[in-house]
Regions:
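Catalytic alpha/beta core domains of metabolic enzymes, predominantly
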Residues: 167-175, 182-301
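Structured C-terminal cap/extension of enzyme domains
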Residues: 62, 245-375
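Boundary at the C-terminal end of the N-terminal hydrophobic targeting segment
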Residues: 30-34
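Glycine-centered loop/turn motif at secondary-structure junctions
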Residues: 75, 111, 134-141, 201, ...
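Short, Lys/Arg-enriched N-terminal segments with co-localized hydrophobic residues
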Residues: 1-10
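A general structural signal for well-ordered alpha-helical segments in protein cores
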Residues: 100, 126, 130, 194, ...
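Active-site beta->alpha loop and helix N-cap motifs at the rims of alpha/beta catalytic domains
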Residues: 35-188
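Bacterial N-terminal signal peptides
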Residues: 18-27
Length: 375
């Protein structure tokens, strides 16, 4: 340093720049940059958690945190909350914020991407959710955090979807998975729109949960995967009913589904895929998964008999669900309208429970043998 004409101290400009850069990098770390997952980490099975409730219908945040750890410890590279239709629509904003915090705290230091739902009845509400997720990331810099977003409920055109997600891309510091299905009233975003947004906001976009109906999902997936590198990962949806085909032939490198009770077998499928298996080794793991989710004479839906397995691993303490007052429950999820809900309880008989116990053991034994064989 040297003195100026007025006796003040003049810093060496190189040192000033060095200090400024150090301060800037420190600020980035504090602001949640450490929590930003890489594109490579945004691949594989990302199960959506089923929200656990107490008997009175209030959210069981302790069990929610345990559920996130169950998925992470099972080997899945990511876990999602809250993104099921009923969770998006029937939880209050305050309940979502509290759940975000519980999951982020539970996954501190774990090698699993916590992907939180940035959704809303309109763009403004979606931005509120995304802004809170960024705040959660600041408070938990050692938790890898991403977002997932479906089109806001009030959009009715491609231009409106683009405008909404463009606003989201401008405020997000982290990857965002586009969910192509919103509600029965929102249009499916065009593939060209998804590519355009990925090119415009490459730090955030380029991840797609493809949810077109039936065979159309495969056709769109091929188009999306052909648009790499702006498009980075295309996740299968709808329970993974076509995931084997999509892994082998359509370029899918991930799955988003509310099947977190089966996290161990989903992780095993992915491990086999990652080590290059494309034949019977991959098919048999997928067949085990399909067996587990296809007990058709049991209480169905994504919150049907799966809740029993979540209770079994300590990720849930009841069989209670919030349900739309006018709900239509299918294997694809719970569908309804509005924010009013009722409580329902999934009931199983002794024989059903006995078989689920056997199936759970089958899954865990299969996964254990798979890990041993890979050594």
């Amino acid at each position: 340093m040297r003195k100026g004409k007025r006796g003040g101290m003049i810093m060496n400009p190189v040192k000033v720049f060095s200090v400024a850069v150090t301060s800037f990098l420190a600020a980035l770390s504090v602001s949640g940059q450490d929590s930003v997952p890489s594109p490579h980490e945004m691949r594989g099975p990302f199960p959506i958690m089923s929200t656990p409730y107490f008997e009175d219908g209030s959210v069981d945040y302790e069990s929610l945190a345990k559920e996130s750890v169950w998925v992470a410890d099972s080997g899945c590279p990511g876990v999602i909350w809250c993104q099921s239709n009923d969770a998006i629509d029937l939880l209050s904003i305050e309940e979502k914020f509290k759940g975000f915090e519980a999951c982020a705290a539970a996954l501190e230091g774990r090698n699993c991407v916590l992907t939180l739902g940035a959704n809303g009845t309109n763009t403004a509400e979606m931005i509120v959710m995304a802004s809170e997720i960024e705040q959660v990331a600041k408070r938990h810099p050692h938790t890898k955090i991403a977002m997932i977003s479906r089109p806001p409920d009030d959009v009715r055109s491609q231009d409106e979807i683009e405008s909404a997600w463009d606003a989201l891309g401008k405020i997000s510091k982290r990857p965002i998975i586009f969910q192509t299905y919103g509600t029965k009233s929102t249009p499916t975003p065009d593939v060209k729109l998804l590519i355009r947004l990925a090119e415009r906001h490459p730090h955030a976009f380029g991840y797609v949960k493809e949810e077109a109906a039936g065979w159309g999902a495969n056709e769109r997936m091929l188009q999306e995967c052909a648009a790499k590198p702006p498009i980075k990962t295309v996740f299968a949806g709808w329970g993974g009913w076509q995931w084997l085909l999509q892994l082998r032939h359509c370029g899918s490198q991930g799955l988003v589904t509310e099947r977190c009770a089966y996290a161990p077998i989903l992780a095993e499928i992915w491990r086999r895929y990652e080590r290059g298996e494309r034949g019977v080794e991959l098919a048999e793991a997928y067949a085990m998964y399909r067996l587990l989710i296809d007990q058709r004479n049991f209480p169905g839906g994504l919150r049907g008999y799966s809740l029993y397995l979540l209770n079994k691993v300590g990720a849930c303490r009841s069989m209670v669900s919030r349900q739309y007052e006018d709900a239509k429950v299918t294997e694809g999820g719970s569908f309804g309208a509005g924010r009013k809900w009722k409580l329902t309880t999934t009931k199983l008989n002794d024989l059903q429970k006995k078989e689920l116990d056997c199936l759970f053991k089958d899954m865990m034994d299969f996964v254990s043998k798979g890990k041993t064989a890979a050594l």
